[in-house]
Amino acid sequence: MPKLILCRHGQSEWNAKNLFTGWEDVNLSEQGINEATRAGEKVRENNIAIDVAFTSLLTRALDTTHYILTESKQQWIPVYKSWRLNERHYGGLQGLNKDDARKEFGEEQVHIWRRSYDVKPPAETEEQREAYLADRRYNHLDKRMMPYSESLKDTLVRVIPFWTDHISQYLLDGQTVLVSAHGNSIRALIKYLEDVSDEDIINYEIKTGAPLVYELTDDLEVIDKYYL
């Protein structure tokens, strides 16, 4: 039976500081390391044999993957990394304190940017964009594909082709797959898997460092889901 494990990275240093993070590359906090370690322990305690893992290009997800596989004694399995699993790009909001953003733009506007399905935050500046384009991890990426800002809908548009072309192929082969990613890239996968409406998906809360297991049919219909 195919099995999919979705796990949002452990708490990051910017999560702890209440900052918009998006594509900014930050480390796990001490709490986040503990969450990721515990996630791996839960995988081991439940005797889940992972065949392959997928993660983003951002350190907090990469490190979470490492802790999960190390603690479950499966660090030797293949791990594939893709920008398509990166967090939603929060544009010009990245690096801002969320409370400060509410004071500057208004509570309602910030809520719309955060929780609407198809509304993007303000675009990043050209200077911010140039910093991403200079980052070696994105050298392979056509700069026309590099977002200035993303809605959840935009995130889904880049995540689902990666699901179809890569992740789902291992599941169709009956394997157990770990996806260690981010709140919004995981939200996009859940929307697709469960056919969640545009209105409902924005209210889904994705816990940090909590493995969410999907048991699937051979054609990848959801049979059951549960947190470890």
Swiss-Prot record:
Record InterPro entries: His_Pase_superF_clade-1, His_PPase_superfam, PG/BPGM_mutase_AS, Phosphogly_mut1
CDD domains assigned: HP_PGM_like
Known pathway: Carbohydrate degradation; glycolysis; pyruvate from D-glyceraldehyde 3-phosphate: step 3/5
A Pfam match: His_Phos_1
One of the protein's GO biological processes: gluconeogenesis
Disulfide bonds: none
MF terms in GO: phosphoglycerate mutase activity
Site (Transition state stabilizer): 182
Keyword Transmembrane: no
Enzyme Commission designation: 5.4.2.11
Enzyme class per UniProt: isomerase
Catalytic residues (positions): 9, 87
HAMAP family named among the record's database cross-references: PGAM_GpmA
Family: Belongs to the phosphoglycerate mutase family. BPG-dependent PGAM subfamily.
Protein name stated in the entry: 2,3-bisphosphoglycerate-dependent phosphoglycerate mutase
Species per Swiss-Prot/TrEMBL record: Staphylococcus aureus (strain NCTC 8325 / PS 47)
